[in-house]
Amino acid sequence: MKIHVTCSKDYDIYLEKGLLEQLHDYIDCQRKIFIISDDNVPECYQQTVSKQFPNSYLHIVKHGEGAKSFAVLEDCLTQMLRRNFSRKDLVIALGGGVIGDLAGFVAASYMRGIDFINIPTTTLSQIDSSIGGKVAINLDGIKNCVGAFYQPEMVLIDPLVLNTLPKRHFYNGLVEAIKAGLIQDKELFELFEQEELDIEQIIYRSLLVKKYVVEQDETEQGLRKILNFGHTIGHAYESYYHLRDYYHGECVALGMMAILKNPEIKERLSKILERLQIDTTCDAKKDKV
């Protein structure tokens, strides 16, 4: 499957099972490449990517929101400088949303911007954060406080890599697809009520929703704010728990449940979240969130 995104810099999203082993069909094997990944990404995936590009350097950071820091950013940029990376070279993100944010901001910052390709490896990043051009790091405990809008050259998605995700991580990422269904695509929402989840279709339809919104409002001046449904309260929960205990999708689920007014839709959402083993109860005090 191929999705073309039209914005300040057009790019394509490719969605295909087994794509990770065919990257050489999409990327020039002779390019000098700085691959940023983390220690949560299975080593077999990192080796599968790096072995296809003889002129690549694999830089692995510690997983978690702590990777989105000035210290890690500086380390990445310093490593690139020491290895004589130029404006003609390429940064690849191989990981989840944190790695996409970090690597994208590294690419946007180095020599005023070099090419960037995103290869998302988590449900959340394949469904949501790999499209839209938002790249950022955190500051003083505030998520995404320093960043830019920087579009990738392309996004390459292999649904098969999701098979190695822990169940909680897998389900956590699906919340963004549920959100996309609620704001724009009734049929996407209904996919979660079927007996078996069609993950490839869920990813595809979720990307189409975000593509439509991003093309209308790339820099979040109006319509794109609809993508923040559930996120205002969700981010408050994330701050309350100091980015621990609850994952991003779980916090967004709490936010959506808190803001939904239609009792029928709220009940359907509750059943879907229960099926995905996402707890919508928490011990946070409302006056502290």
Regions found by a protein language model. Give the residues of each.
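Short glycine/proline-enriched coil/turn segments at helix->beta-strand junctions
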Residues: 28-32, 51-57, 112, 195-198, ...
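Short glycine/serine/threonine-rich phosphate/pyrophosphate-binding segments
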Residues: 98-104, 126-127, 235-236
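Active-site and donor-binding regions of nucleotide-sugar-utilizing enzymes
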Residues: 85-117
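Active-site segments that bind and position negatively charged phosphate/pyrophosphate groups
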Residues: 191-287
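Glycine-rich beta-strand-to-loop/alpha-helix junction loops that act as flexible
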Residues: 63-64, 94-96, 229-230
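ATP/NTP phosphate-donor binding region
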Residues: 1-90
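A glycine/threonine-rich phosphate-anchoring loop and its flanking beta-alpha core
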Residues: 14, 28, 105-194
